[in-house]
């Protein structure tokens, strides 16, 4: 009995430790077991910009087509502000770069009057989307564009779309007109690059589209760290995350060319992604370009353009929340930016079910409660088998203690006597372990569903819980969880081994302290799960006791 419970506690504890260590590494913090280099590299002498950790053979030398350096010459430029129903933003006329993007429907958890800013370019933070041409002395993101047809830059009540166009200076016989199309209610931005050959010779440019970001960590609740960094998706390799640390060490491994897929920057709850046209050949690159500054992008070749002719390259830019159903409708595999890790195969159906329940009850907190009840109901036969095994072990515990006392000076005889007792009573000391172990992947999957789902962000439950993605402000749920864990422990007999007895008392305290800083939605799940487990164990144990009291 005591051995089995110790094994279960060790499994639970190690699972929690591994999850936390995974958060540390995904969030750019050193592993508790395998420390790695930090993301921020020493500043280069003189502040020079370069390609840094470019993988050999990945991006050619600058003259042959690498995206330009981030260092821009001094020139007059301005910020063009715009507004839609979902965005407030700024386009920098230097390069026609999308330099700031605020999500108007995503409030700040700590300051309700503020909104989440995804793209930004300030002294302390850089995150932007930009494009340009390679293959010659053509317009790129360092050149100052001119806004065409300046007028209203806001999406008015009678408009469904807002178009903003910017024209480059002529360079290398080429002029570029870049048009952003914003659609009402959509987090997908159309980006059209029109290339006009105004020279006297054919040109064969390449369009690059990239996301540039520093490695500044996103502020999240304690113990809620998820992946931050570039990602690539192709039909051949599917979803590939790229750690900033791998770019630091020039060890990033990802698909380098395709005619499908997308590239993205991923963070907790939000993402951005360049989505070129399906079937268009493109090269994919990801690299470090400055101390603590990285980029991921695609380079799409354009067929030769004769003098006086033009070519259009169309792409889409997603920038918004990681809402799973919305992402599924935008591009194949884009929903994978909502990263469940190795439990995706279980987590996705769980989120589908959670979403269906929410559709009926209209409250994510109650949806979590009902989903937990459903999961416990599904696993009731396994739980019953576990509790029955525990009850049988509890019955023979006095005899086990007597054997231990009798043979305490001879461990070999004691083990033989215990095995004989198990055989005689037809009891498996580990009989209650397997049913619990089988359920662990499901519980971990639900944990990641609640952690990764932006739908929980800002979602209230009842009374004092106004945001399920933030910790309980009054620590009521963590206290309830601590109480429930102590009740669960008290339902089982105290192990005869003093060390194991201390461990059984320490574990609830350790987990309770850790859960004080978990998002309220996660703690709610564990509280409900514990309460249901206590009820199940009480019911099954009482039922077994009633059966044994009946006359033969």
Swiss-Prot record:
The chain crosses the membrane at residues 7-24, 364-384, 434-454, 473-493, 508-528. GO terms for cellular component: plasma membrane. GO terms for molecular function: membrane insertase activity. One of its GO terms (biological process) is protein transport. Its main location: membrane. InterPro entries: Membr_insert_YidC, Membr_insert_YidC_N, YidC/ALB3/OXA1/COX18, YidC/Oxa/ALB_C, YidC_ALB_C, YidC_periplasmic_sf. It is a multi-pass membrane protein. Keywords: Cell inner membrane, Cell membrane, Chaperone, Membrane, Protein transport, Transmembrane, Transmembrane helix, Transport. It is found in: Cell inner membrane. Interacts with the Sec translocase complex via SecD. Specifically interacts with transmembrane segments of nascent integral membrane proteins during membrane integration. HAMAP family: YidC_type1. Required for the insertion and/or proper folding and/or complex formation of integral membrane proteins into the membrane. Involved in integration of membrane proteins that insert both dependently and independently of the Sec translocase complex, as well as at least some lipoproteins. Aids folding of multispanning membrane proteins. Belongs to the OXA1/ALB3/YidC family. Type 1 subfamily. This is Membrane protein insertase YidC. It comes from Burkholderia cenocepacia (strain ATCC BAA-245 / DSM 16553 / LMG 16656 / NCTC 13227 / J2315 / CF5610). The gene is yidC.
């Amino acid at each position: 009995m005591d051995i089995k419970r110790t094994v279960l506690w060790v499994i639970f504890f190690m699972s929690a430790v591994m999850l936390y260590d995974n958060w540390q590494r995904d969030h750019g913090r050193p592993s508790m077991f395998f420390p790695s280099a930090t993301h921020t590299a020493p500043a280069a002498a003189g502040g020079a910009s370069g390609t840094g950790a470019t993988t050999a053979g990945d991006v050619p030398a600058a003259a042959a087509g690498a995206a330009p350096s981030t260092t821009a010459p001094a020139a007059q430029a301005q910020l063009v502000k715009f507004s839609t129903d979902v965005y407030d933003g700024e386009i920098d006329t230097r390069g026609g770069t999308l330099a700031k993007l605020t999500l108007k429907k995503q409030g700040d958890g700590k300051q309700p009057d503020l909104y989440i800013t995804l793209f930004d370019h300030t002294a302390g933070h850089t995150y932007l989307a930009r494009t340009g041409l390679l293959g010659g002395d053509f317009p790129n993101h360092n050149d100052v564009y001119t806004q065409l047809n300046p007028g209203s830059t806001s999406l008015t009540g009678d408009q469904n779309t807002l178009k903003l166009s910017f024209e480059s200076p002529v360079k290398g016989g080429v002029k570029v007109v870049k048009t952003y199309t914003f659609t009402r209610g959509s987090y997908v931005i159309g980006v059209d690059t029109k290339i006009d050959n105004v020279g006297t010779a054919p040109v064969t440019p390449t369009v690059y589209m990239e996301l540039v970001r520093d490695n500044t960590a996103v502020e999240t609740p304690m113990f809620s760290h998820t992946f931050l960094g570039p990602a690539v998706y192709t039909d051949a390799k599917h979803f590939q995350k790229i750690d900033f640390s791998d770019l630091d060490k020039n060890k990033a491994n990802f698909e380098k060319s395709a005619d499908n897929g997308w590239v993205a920057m991923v963070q907790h709850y939000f993402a951005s992604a360049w989505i070129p046209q399906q079937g268009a050949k493109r090269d994919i690159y990801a690299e470090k370009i400055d101390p603590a500054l990285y980029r991921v992008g695609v380079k799409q070749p354009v067929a030769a353009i004769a003098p006086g002719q033009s070519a259009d390259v169309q792409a889409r830019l997603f920038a918004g929340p990681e809402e799973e159903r919305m992402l599924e409708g935008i591009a194949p595999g884009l929903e994978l930016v909502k990263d469940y890790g190795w439990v995706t195969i279980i987590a996705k159906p769980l989120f589908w079910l959670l979403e269906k329940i929410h559709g009926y009850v209209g409250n994510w907190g109650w949806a979590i409660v009902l989903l937990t009840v459903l999961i416990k109901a599904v696993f009731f036969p396994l739980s019953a088998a576990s509790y029955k095994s525990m009850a049988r072990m509890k019955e023979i515990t006095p005899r086990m203690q007597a054997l231990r006392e009798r043979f305490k000076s001879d461990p070999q005889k004691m083990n033989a006597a215990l095995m004989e007792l198990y055989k005689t009573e037809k009891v498996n000391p580990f009989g209650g372990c397997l049913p619990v172990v089988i359920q662990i992947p499901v519980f971990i999957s639900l944990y990641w569903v609640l952690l990764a789902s932006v739908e929980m962000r800002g979602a209230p439950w009842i009374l004092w819980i106004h945001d399920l993605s933030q910790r309980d402000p009054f620590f009521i749920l963590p206290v309830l969880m601590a109480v429930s864990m102590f009740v669960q422990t008290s339902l089982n007999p105290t192990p005869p081994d003093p060390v194991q007895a201390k461990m059984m008392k320490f574990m609830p305290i350790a987990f309770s302290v850790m859960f004080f800083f978990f998002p309220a939605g996660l703690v709610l799940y564990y509280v409900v799960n514990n309460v249901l487990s206590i009820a199940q164990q009480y019911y099954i144990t009482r039922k077994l006791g009633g059966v044994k009291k009946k006359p033969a």
